[in-house]
């Protein structure tokens, strides 16, 4: 027996599962989104109709007929995607504004239901003109639509779209209409139910109900609440049967898409239509069964009753097929009508077994059941009769054939030959039926219908043929032909079409007369009063505009107008193009419709036309029912005073912001050039030009400015500034600079002093006491300067006072009443200067914020409470708060206090009542508490009971730990930090210590010290200090902490914890989580080398010891011996265990590691830490088993350093001094935080990126060209990636993630490719490199470089345990580890890199890094010391220096070079150049040869794969940045020549050169071809380099777009630490923007070709993220797997 079919194949199963999952992911990514709410039955209908398309249900709207509309939308999307710019027939009014690609729309004058549709049409945009013409009977306003119908219109278009609008036209009529339009293709959607082919009746299917009266067919779908479709039956039948039109206008009709009985017909004009038979309903789910007695007969005296009966009934195909199969296979004796009825009844019930539908069922009427039983019974009877007759006649025929004689057979063999047309069985013709016989059948199966009919064109072909013959006869007689009398249709080109969009013209059309309006015109505000009236502008703004005039310079090009508007000292630029987006102050979007041929433009309710006249430019405005004509004369307007212009711009901005707050949908955002321009109120592409575009004034005219400026005082106080002014005793200084200003405008009044005795009118004395002496009491001060007081809020000297107001901001009770008594004018709503949520800001009579907390008497709303505090932070200066809601609204004090803590700003103040102050005293921040639960107390008491039975623990008898809360102070510190010596005898009564040695040491100092068990008698009610608290048994620790009056813990959490000697399991269960209240990081005991070894456990450790090296290996034992186990203590007399040595200090020690301590040291590194930190001068380590080396305690780093030729000495440090930029300009303060979602969506819109359907792509693995690849047995891979992200739109290249298939593709695709070798000398290249790096002298690696190497390792959390002795026979010494890298390179192109392999990160062994690292650091220092002044290397410079150098090169251009496959193209030549430079520096020859050997042939070790290869460069090797930068400099210096080189910068494969001109060197070709270099040079005014934008004359500016784009790729999870790291990175980036934010807006927008508003928005978004207010989304995306196989070739 073979059993191979039962063997499980995991690989095949996994592959099948992955393929299935990939298919499912692909289906979901391309699914049809169903938005309406549906019933369960409607959902099933849609799923069946839309198969095999995947559906995604997201119900959010109610539709009257959802099934038809979903199908309609799907077919509409198909038609519009393929038709492009087209003519649309019978467009739905609601779709007009959504489809700008339509050239022309043909309508009929509305009647009946169409009138209702036009009334509900949009009243804005292009639909508004169509609606107005349809309802008022007006002629069309332009040529984009007509009401002549498709048959009566002659607008030329090559392609057309008709969505359910041709049901009243025959195919012949459509053919003629298409000919009139010059149309070659027409996409038409039809509803063609098969029931129209049947006789009149009522037909109910699973999807719809169709009533057919012989002339009209009415279709109503399941669940519809409106009237159904009503079509002409004869027309529908023609469309179902017809596949072509013949005659003068031949057509081919093809069904290109179908959903149920909805079809898309592609009607194409073809000269010679060919037969195109088709099956219209191949997926029909119904069979139509004939009812013998139906409306066709006369069954009763009431003919009206017959109209609701059907001659055919729709029966599900599965019901009919199963019924016929059952009846046809029944035994003759069992066949009867009752048995058929019983079976039909059984299969008509729906049966579900779990999730499996065993029987779909059928809900049929009595008439349908009767007809089905009758038809089935008669059909089966007929079939049984045929079966009987066929068998009988067949048997007789067989008898006759077999009875034939030889002569008859010979005759058949000779004369009855079989030809090609012979079909077995055709010789038998026993029975022939007639179509009209009853035996011909009782049912119609639509699945078998085939149609291929043609209809003739309805034009008068006979008359035209006769006329043609007559013309020919007249010509034969020599007369003129009368064909010219035939009217010519309007066609284009050689055919006379009037639409230039028509494609196919071979004759040049006549050029129309062009209207050129280029020139300068004078715009006077007094002439635009009608426009201002239509815009409903306030009177003061109209008055200011009337006093101004502007000069507008227009430049007209093809389809474009460029306007430069000069208003006083300000210049604005606008660009008018069709489809330009207009800036609005709400969620609605407006696009400009601009027709340069018709000289018109429109958007929303605004439209205008213009024309050049003798007097200048005439503009006709039509806005909101008001019309006016204005003629703008040519010339230049007089210059307006700058103060008037500034005042006008400020008033206009205030009007925009007020409209934005008061409008729900928003309106057009008005710019100065929009009101004082040629084409008001339009200002697309608004740009403000100034001599100093970075002063910040341009933000005033855009809607991204977030302040409201009524007075200069408001500007000084209200803004989105996040950093409060420094607070030092008095009130903080408040910025009061002008928001609108120029050199001519006066300075605004300073902020009035609201804290002195002279107050504005309406203000009452602020102090609650007549003497003016503050009665407040300070309770707590936060690190950020915020303070908590108990007392009156009116004693505060803060800039703002916060009132606990109500939602209506009316005077109330409590604190609100006190505010009303002192400041009654502050409740005047007309004087509120700003609202943020429910909070209201006022400056009358002093700055006050009315905040609204939730009413907890009605509903607990923590989110509203948080918002109440958050809404008070949109200010400058400090604020004094009460506890919002804690009074009348009964908000708990704790909740309100926590909300204030989370939402206050630096130097703010909180004022508490006496009752709230008592709560605060008992819950003071910074005092940790230990919560002893009942379970913990129960376990501790059990441990105490066990101890009391022993000799040592007799003192614990009767002691008990109770559940509760214990407060404590915990001083933690590094070993030897002086924790114990800091305790004074006057501060403590009892000291508890874990060991006798420590007890004796404390007693020698005069303290009353006890061991833990003995101390149980004396700690009750005493001041207790517990030394080495983490090592105390936890049940005794809890006992003493609970009994003591006050407890002060000393200890080190990283040292040996309490040990469960009895193995009861209670110690780990009871051990408490103690939080240190203070950390001491300075040790007075440990030497420097010990500090470096233990820095992994103590990152901030520092020492006062002068001893640099104290650890020695292999020397004789000295001083106190320290061992790890009791067995070793017995073997070495005089020694103590490490546990006993905790807290002790010795001058010299000897650590003896024995083999029996292996498990202890490996499981508890704390034992090794304690052993290392006991000495002050010298420690000898005897580690024959190598236990301490396994945990990182080794001298291999030092030994290898001296082995490589290192020397003891000093070098200059490699740290480059850097500083944070001062706030000398602080333009970043003008950028308020903005919405993260809108910023990323705007970035996606500008870059053209969309949400990626997949997280990454696994490309096909290429062929292995060189090397040897080792594969794992299993290629398991994850199918999806979970990310915690800021947005679902990623702007970085997404390559394959870290998994097996991706690792293989990267190994083979990048490092398994054949290397192009180049054998040549390095002299020429080194000579070229000397332009940047002169000849290096002898370099020495000193202990300074060794220290920097160790310091870098410590900063990365490494302890040196991986550094081994230099044994080249050990694989661990030379191993190169490979990791797959998630590619996160920002790109403005395609983000999903299809077909591109990933990138790798390599890690050389720590031994090699420690061996080569000091030398490479020394070489790098030598290079930096010899670099020319204008050359910048890596990141070894301060950013301000590089920026200053770039700013100095104001007349230079930027040369950029982008390397492709930089690492992969490095070969033997680049490696030889590196080795030549090493030899030039004096590195030992054996070290150079070792480096060459490791680099020339290597093995990359992945987690489960490995690759043996040659030559390729690895990005993670020691000196990677050094040698990549040197190779980059060598290529640039050898391949290019630069004129006027002013600045050059190199970092890795990135380079930039500022020069006036460049060219390729003569010898560059050989190097480029020999090494296979791929260089992509660019030469432009502004460039990109290493994350900055290089702008000559301005400096090096932070690349905001790139930084924001890279943030979109980051995974901000899964733990909060990752999010905090990224938030800090954002804050660092914002600090670089402090003084250059406005410059970045202009420069970065130009280099990327995006709008300045985007960069402005991105900066605001970064501030939101930096404040910790970002919103994250968890997404799960699939991985697209394109791998197929891995091909390799043996070397």
From Swiss-Prot:
Gene Ontology BP terms: DNA-templated transcription; methylation; mRNA modification; proteolysis; RNA processing; viral protein processing; viral RNA genome replication
Domain (+)RNA virus helicase C-terminal: 1081-1214
Pfam families assigned to the protein according to its UniProt record, in alphabetical order: DUF3729, Macro, Peptidase_C41, RdRP_2, Viral_helicase1, Vmethyltransf
Alphavirus-like MT domain mapped to chain residues: 56-240
GO cellular component: host cell perinuclear region of cytoplasm
Source superkingdom: Viruses
Binding, ATP: 973-980
Region Zinc-binding, residue ranges: 510-691
Keywords: ATP-binding, Disulfide bond, Helicase, Host cytoplasm, Hydrolase, Magnesium, Metal-binding, Methyltransferase, Nucleotide-binding, Nucleotidyltransferase, Protease, RNA-binding, RNA-directed RNA polymerase, Thiol protease, Transferase, Viral RNA replication, Zinc
Domain (+)RNA virus helicase ATP-binding: 932-1080
Subunit structure as annotated in this protein's UniProt entry: The protease domain interacts with host EIF2AK4 (via C-terminus); this interaction inhibits dimerization of EIF2AK4 and prevents EIF2AK4-mediated phosphorylation of host EIF2A.
Listed name of the protein: Non-structural polyprotein pORF1
Natural source organism: Hepatitis E virus genotype 2 (isolate Human/Mexico) (HEV-2)
Lineage: Viruses, Riboviria, Orthornavirae, Kitrinoviricota, Alsuviricetes
């Amino acid at each position: 027996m073979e059993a191979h079919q039962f063997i499980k194949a995991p690989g095949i199963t996994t592959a099948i599962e992955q393929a299935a999952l990939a298919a499912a992911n692909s289906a979901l990514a391309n699914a049809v989104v169903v938005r309406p709410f549906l019933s369960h039955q409607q959902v099933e209908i849609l799923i069946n109709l839309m198969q095999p398309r995947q559906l995604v249900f997201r119900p959010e709207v109610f539709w009257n007929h959802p099934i038809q509309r979903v199908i309609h939308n799907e077919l509409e999307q198909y038609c519009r995607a393929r038709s492009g710019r087209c003519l649309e027939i019978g467009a739905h009014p609601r779709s007009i504004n959504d489809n700008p690609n339509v050239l022309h729309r043909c309508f009929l004058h509305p009647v009946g239901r169409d009138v209702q549709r036009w009334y509900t049409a949009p009243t804005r945009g292009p639909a508004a003109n169509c609606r107005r013409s349809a309802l008022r009977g007006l002629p069309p306003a332009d040529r984009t639509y007509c009401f002549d119908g498709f048959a009566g219109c002659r607008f030329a278009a090559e392609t057309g779209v008709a969505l359910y609008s041709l049901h009243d036209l025959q195919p012949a009529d459509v053919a003629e209409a298409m000919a009139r339009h010059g149309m070659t293709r027409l996409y038409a959607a039809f509803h063609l139910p098969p029931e129209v082919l049947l006789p009149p009746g009522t037909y109910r299917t699973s999807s719809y109900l169709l009533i057919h009266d012989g002339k009209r067919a009415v279709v109503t779908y399941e669940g519809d609440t409106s009237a159904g479709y009503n079509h002409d039956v004869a027309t529908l039948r023609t469309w179902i049967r017809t596949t072509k039109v013949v005659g003068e206008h031949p057509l081919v009709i093809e069904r290109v898409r179908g959903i149920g009985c909805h079809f898309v017909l592609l009607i194409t004009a073809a000269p010679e239509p060919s037969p195109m038979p088709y099956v219209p309903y191949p997926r029909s789910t119904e069979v139509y069964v004939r009812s013998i007695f139906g409306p066709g007969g006369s069954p009763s005296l009431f003919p009206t009753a017959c109209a609701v009966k059907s001659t055919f009934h729709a029966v599900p195909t599965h019901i009919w097929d199963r019924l016929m199969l059952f009846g046809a296979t029944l035994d003759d004796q069992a066949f009867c009508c009752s048995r058929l009825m019983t079976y039909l009844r059984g299969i008509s019930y729906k049966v579900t077994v779990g999730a499996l539908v065993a029987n779909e069922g059928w809900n049929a009427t009595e008439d349908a059941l009767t007809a089905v039983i009758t038809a089935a019974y008669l059909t089966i009877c007929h079939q049984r009769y045929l079966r009987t007759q066929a068998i009988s006649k067949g048997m007789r025929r067989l008898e006759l054939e077999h009875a034939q004689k030889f002569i008859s057979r010979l005759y058949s063999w000779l004369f009855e030959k079989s030809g090609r047309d012979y079909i077995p069985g055709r010789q038998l013709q026993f029975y022939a039926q007639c179509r009209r016989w009853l035996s011909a059948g009782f049912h119609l199966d639509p699945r078998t219908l085939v149609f291929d009919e043609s209809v003739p064109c309805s034009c008068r072909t006979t008359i035209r043929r006769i006329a043609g013959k007559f013309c020919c006869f007249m010509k034969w007689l020599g007369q003129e032909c009368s064909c010219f009398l035939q009217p010519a249709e309007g066609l284009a080109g050689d055919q006379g079409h009037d639409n230039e969009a028509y494609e196919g013209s071979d004759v040049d059309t006549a050029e129309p007369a062009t209207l050129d309006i280029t020139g300068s015109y004078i715009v006077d505000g007094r002439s635009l009063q009608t426009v201002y009236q239509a815009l409903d502008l306030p009177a003061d703004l109209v008055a200011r505009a009337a006093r101004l005039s502007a000069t507008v310079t227009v430049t007209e090009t093809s389809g474009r107008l460029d306007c430069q508007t000069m208003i006083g000292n300000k210049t604005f630029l606008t660009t008018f193009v069709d489809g330009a987006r207009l800036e609005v102050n709400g969620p609605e979007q407006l696009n400009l419709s601009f027709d340069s041929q018709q000289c018109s433009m429109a958007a929303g309710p605004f439209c205008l036309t213009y024309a050049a006249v003798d007097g200048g430019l005439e503009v006709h405005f039509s806005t909101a029912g008001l019309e006016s004509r204005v003629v703008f004369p040519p010339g230049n307007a007089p210059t307006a005073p700058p103060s008037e212009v500034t005042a006008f711009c400020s008033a206009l901005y205030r009007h925009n912001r007020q409209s934005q707050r008061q409008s729900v949908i928003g309106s057009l955002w008005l710019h100065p050039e929009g009101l004082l321009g040629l084409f008001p109120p339009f200002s697309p592409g608004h740009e403000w030009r100034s001599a100093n575009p970075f002063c910040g004034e341009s933000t005033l005219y855009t809607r991204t400015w977030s302040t409201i400026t009524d007075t200069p005082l408001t500007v000084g106080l209200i803004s989105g500034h996040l950093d409060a002014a420094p607070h030092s005793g008095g009130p903080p200084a408040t910025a009061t600079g002008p928001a609108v200003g120029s050199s001519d405008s006066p300075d605004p009044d300073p902020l009035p002093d609201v804290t002195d005795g002279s107050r504005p009118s309406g203000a009452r004395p602020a102090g609650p006491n007549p003497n003016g002496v503050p009665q407040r009491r300070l309770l707590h001060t936060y690190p950020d300067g915020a303070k908590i007081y108990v007392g009156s809020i009116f004693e505060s000297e803060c800039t703002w006072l916060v009132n606990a107001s109500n939602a209506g901001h009316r005077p109330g009770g409590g604190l609100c009443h006190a505010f009303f008594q002192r400041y009654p004018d502050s409740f005047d709503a007309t004087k509120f200067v700003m609202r943020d949520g429910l909070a209201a800001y006022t400056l009358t009579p002093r700055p006050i914020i009315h905040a609204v907390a939730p009413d907890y008497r009605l509903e607990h709303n923590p989110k509203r409470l948080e918002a109440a505090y958050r809404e008070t932070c949109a200010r400058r200066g400090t604020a004094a708060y009460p506890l919002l809601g804690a009074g009348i609204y009964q908000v708990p004090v704790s909740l309100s206090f926590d909300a204030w803590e989370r939402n206050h700003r630096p130097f703010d103040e909180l004022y508490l009542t006496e009752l709230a102050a008592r709560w605060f005293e008992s819950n003071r921040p910074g005092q940790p508490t230990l919560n002893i639960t009942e379970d913990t107390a129960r376990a501790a008491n059990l441990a105490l009971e066990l101890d009391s039975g022993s000799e040592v623990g007799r003192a614990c008898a009767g002691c008990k730990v109770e559940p509760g809360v214990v407060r404590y102070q915990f001083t933690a510190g590094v070993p030897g930090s002086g924790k114990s010596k800091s305790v004074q005898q006057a501060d403590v009564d009892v000291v508890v210590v874990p060991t006798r040695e420590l007890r004796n040491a404390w007693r020698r100092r005069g303290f009353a010290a006890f061991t833990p068990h003995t101390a149980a008698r004396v700690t009750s009610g005493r001041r207790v200090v517990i030394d080495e608290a983490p090592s105390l048994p936890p049940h005794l620790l809890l006992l003493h902490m609970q009994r003591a009056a006050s407890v002060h813990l000393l200890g080190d959490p990283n040292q040996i914890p309490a040990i469960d000697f009895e193995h009861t399991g209670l110690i780990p269960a009871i051990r408490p989580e103690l939080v240190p209240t203070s950390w001491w990081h300075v040790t007075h005991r440990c030497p420097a080398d010990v500090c470096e070894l233990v820095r992994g456990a103590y990152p901030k450790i520092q020492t006062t010891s002068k001893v640099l090296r104290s650890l020695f290996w292999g020397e004789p034992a000295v001083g106190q011996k320290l061992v790890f186990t009791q067995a070793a203590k017995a073997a070495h007399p005089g020694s103590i265990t490490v546990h006993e040595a905790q807290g002790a200090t010795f001058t010299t020690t000897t650590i003896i590691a024995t083999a029996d301590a292996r498990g202890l040291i490996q499981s508890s590194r704390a034992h090794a830490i304690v052993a290392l930190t006991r000495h002050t001068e010298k420690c000898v380590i005897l580690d024959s088993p190598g236990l301490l080396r396994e945990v990182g305690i080794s001298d291999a780093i030092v030994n290898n350093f001296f082995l490589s030729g290192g020397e003891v000495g000093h070098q200059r440090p490699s740290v480059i001094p850097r500083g944070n930029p001062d706030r000398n300009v602080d333009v970043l303060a003008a950028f308020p935080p903005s919405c993260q979602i809108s910023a990323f969506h705007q970035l996606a819109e500008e870059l053209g990126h969309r949400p990626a359907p997949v997280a990454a792509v696994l490309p096909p693995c290429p062929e292995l060209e060189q090397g040897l690849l080792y594969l794992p047995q299993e290629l398991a891979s994850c199918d999806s990636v979970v990310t915690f992200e800021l947005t679902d739109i990623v702007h970085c290249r997404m390559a394959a993630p870290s998994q097996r298939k991706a690792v293989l593709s990267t190994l083979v695709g990048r490092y398994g490719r054949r290397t192009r070798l180049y054998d040549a000398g390095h002299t020429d290249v080194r000579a070229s490199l000397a332009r940047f790096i002169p000849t290096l002298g002898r370099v020495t690696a000193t202990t300074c470089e060794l220290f920097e190497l160790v310091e870098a390792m410590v900063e990365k959390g490494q302890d040196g345990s991986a550094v081994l002795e230099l044994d080249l026979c050990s694989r661990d010494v030379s191993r190169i580890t490979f990791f797959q890298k998630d590619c996160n390179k920002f790109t403005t192109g395609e983000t999903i890199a299809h077909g591109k392999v990933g990138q790798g990160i390599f890690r050389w062994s720590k031994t090699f890094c420690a061996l080569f690292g000091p030398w490479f650091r020394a070489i790098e220092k030598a290079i930096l010391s010899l670099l020319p002044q204008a050359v910048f290397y890596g990141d070894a410079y301060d950013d301000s220096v590089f920026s200053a150098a770039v700013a100095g090169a104001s007349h230079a251009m930027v040369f950029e070079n982008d390397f492709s496959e930089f690492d992969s193209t490095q070969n033997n030549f680049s490696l030889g150049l590196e080795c030549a430079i090493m030899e030039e520096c004096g590195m030992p020859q054996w070290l150079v040869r070792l480096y060459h050997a490791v680099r020339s042939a290597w093995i990359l070790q992945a987690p489960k794969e490995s690759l043996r290869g040659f030559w390729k460069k690895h990005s993670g090797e020691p000196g990677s940045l050094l040698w990549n930068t040197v190779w980059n400099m060598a290529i640039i210096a050898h391949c290019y020549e630069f004129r006027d080189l002013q600045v050059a910068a190199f970092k890795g494969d990135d380079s930039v050169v500022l020069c006036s001109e460049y060219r390729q060197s003569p010898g560059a070709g050989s190097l480029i071809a020999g090494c296979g270099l791929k260089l992509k040079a660019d030469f432009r005014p502004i460039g990109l380099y290493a994350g900055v934008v290089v702008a000559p004359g301005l400096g090096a500016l932070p690349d905001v777009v790139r930084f924001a784009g890279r943030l979109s790729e980051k995974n901000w999870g899964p733990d909060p630490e990752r999010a905090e790291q990224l938030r800090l990175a954002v804050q660092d980036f914002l600090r670089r923007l402090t003084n250059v934010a406005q410059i970045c807006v202009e420069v970065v927008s130009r280099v990327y070709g995006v709008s300045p508003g985007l960069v402005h928005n991105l900066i605001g978004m970064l501030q939101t993220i930096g404040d910790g207010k970002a919103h994250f989304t968890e997404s799960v995306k699939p991985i697209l797997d394109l791998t197929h196989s891995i091909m390799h070739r043996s070397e």
